[in-house]
Amino acid sequence: MKKFLILAALLLPLASVAQQYKVTGKVPTKTKVYLFRTPGFVKEQADSVVAKNGTFTFTGTTTQPELYYIVKKAAKTGQPATIVPIVADGNVVVDFTTETPSGTAENDALKAALMQVKPYAQGLRAVEKQFEDLELSGKEPSEDELTKLADSYEQAQALMIEAVAAICKNNMDKTYPAYFIIDYYSLIEKPTLYKFYDEKAKFMQPSATSHVSQLIEGWKRREPGQTFTDFEMEDLSGATRKLSDYVGKGNYVLVDFWASWCGPCRREIPNVKALYDKYHAQGFDVVGVSFDSDKAPWLNAIKKMNLPWHNISDLKGWKSKAAALYGINSIPSTLLIDPQGKIIATDLHGEELETQLNTIYEKSDVASMPNK
């Protein structure tokens, strides 16, 4: 009896770890159906089956309920695939007609949420269609037409995001809102996302939303008032440099995240050069952090644009340690750091950056600061 109890105690954690799921649905015989997972920003195919007798089935186990996608490719070339999000948890039924899941409490709730958001998504799509029709007409739209369409788009988007945020706020103990976090995190206000993260909402726990959690951690590191987080990369000569070699040394420093292939980055550089020329003698400095993956284009761009400041890179593209560290998912992006190493502003460009630097260097104590 004692041995049985010990064995049962050892097996109990294993039983709680492995959770089985079964996904079924109806499609025409011989239709190929796919199961995708989202361990990052890109969905990855994990399994596929060919329907038999008008049905398909996926089975598997997870350590916790996870968000997956069931995909049926279109019968005709050029048509979009049908994608249904599911929570892999128990017996799930996929309906490709309504593009919804059901069968468990999580999936029934996800179905209801999808139906709730659908009218808002349709409203947004209707405005997008008006933009497309206007472009295809070949007519030059008036300023008034463009303003009205832009306002309509913003209003439709705001209504949809309000609905999405409410679904998440009211279901902190559920997994299924992970679908909305993945699709709409970039539009949800950061304080709201921070709340979900800080309060450990269940939908922030699956692997599907881990990349969003990592972004939030990075965003927090770049909040104004935070001390910069150090990292190492190589300079043009191949020597290892730390960000702290240039930052927190008594001068204001702009850390400019860019890449040679980034058109908006290169268009912004003349503005930065003008400000560098204007204020460098008073201590202003720039550190260019490239998200290039090949050294030659990086070096050529620096030479062609005659960049006079410090330049570093780990040549890992979007897998750059700086991207993960500071939650950067688009460039150009900047950090303006004060003489003590505190971040005072982020993503300043053009006139905004010029105004900020003008304000800083109008102060007599800064104006008299010696160059580094």
Segments the model singles out, each with a brief description of its role:
Residues 232-253:
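A short beta-strand-turn-helix
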Residues 1-24, 364, 371:
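Bacterial Sec-dependent N-terminal signal peptides
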Residues 257-274:
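Conserved redox-active cysteine motifs that mediate thiol-disulfide chemistry
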Residues 299-340:
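Short, internal strand/loop/helix patches
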Residues 80, 93, 146, 154-227, ...:
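N-terminal targeting signals for export/organelle localization
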Residues 19-159:
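A non-transmembrane, solvent-exposed segment enriched in polar/low-complexity residues
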Residues 339-372:
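Thiol-/selenol-based redox modules, centered on thioredoxin-like
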